[in-house]
Amino acid sequence: MPRNIRRLTLAALLAGVVSLPAAAQAPAWPQKPIRLLVAAPAGSAPDLIARIIGDKLGKALAQPVLIDNKPGAGGIVAMNLLKSAPADGYTLALPQAAVVVVTPHTYKEASYDAERDFQTIAMVGKTPMMFVANMAHPAKTFADAVSMAKAKPDQVSVGNPTRTSIPHLAAELVGMKTDAKFQQVSFANTGQGLQAVVNGDIALYTDGVGPLLQLVKAGKLRPLAVASETELPGLEGLPLANKTVPGLNVYGWFILQAPRGTPAPVVQRLNAEVNKAMGEADVVARFREFGTYPTPGTVADAERFLTNEKALFSGVIRTLGLKPE
């Protein structure tokens, strides 16, 4: 064998030998606590959902998952922190739907894109939107409400917890799909909106099932429809919105994300552990308290869902002519 070839072969062998210990000694993930950013204050539904999942992940990974609440600015603070974090699996976020698919279109300061800047790991849970009426209002069904808003444009009021929230956009979507024209009334928070519809200050109200179900069961609000594809446990007998308005399936949701570039093995491990957690009876029961339903699936499932939701809500926002403020 020529001398130069022998030298190249020896160099290659030595390089392989030298690299073996480094690969063998690469530390397994995780080796330290994991930070989980939440774009909502402590005690809120997003915070409590994050703590449920964080507790399960911490036990499965044998490392604490530390909840870091960063509310404000439509979720921009939390998501900017995620965007600038190292892509090493030690900083995650669990944003709610509006933070991911609405804020980038309505806040000038939002410089992130949920698909470009972040690695989606798993869908954690979905909360279907619900349409209710004041008990004295003549609309007995969802079809009644739509017909009334068609016959008398801007005379049937429908409330929502805040402007450009998922409930607000869900109600706007009803009008877009049916040519019904509701009078949209946005409040400062859920409590104000619920009080208004119970008192009869507004006719209808839209929100996630969590805040509404107790009042419906107490006979203080009339359920008109739930905007989910199929009937869900605990909501048996409630009409589906898509029976009146085809394709009207609208949810609030929570999605686990990491900085773009996070190693694939870390992403897959997190996805697997989240799916395990969502199959546990105590998680299902605790989620149900918020009207949230676990949604296990693959990373690809979560990415596909996010793509579809971005398209849906960007279309609604564009049709409404809403601009970043």
Name these PLM-found stretches.
Residues 31-33, 176-180, 217, 223, ...:
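An extracytoplasmic/periplasmic, membrane-proximal ligand-sensing/linker region
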Residues 14, 96-98, 127, 137, ...:
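Short, flexible active-site-adjacent loop segments at beta-strand->alpha-helix junctions, enriched
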Residues 24-116, 154-155, 177-204, 296-297, ...:
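N-terminal (or domain-start) structured segment
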Residues 98-109, 173-177, 204-237:
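A ligand-binding cleft/hinge motif common to bilobed small-molecule-binding domains
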Residues 1-31, 143, 325:
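Short, low-complexity disordered leader/linker segments with a strong preference
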Residues 45-49, 53, 57, 74, ...:
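Stable alpha-helical elements in mature extracytoplasmic
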Residues 57, 81-90, 105-192, 240-241, ...:
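Hinge/capping helix and adjacent helix->loop/strand transition within the periplasmic-binding protein
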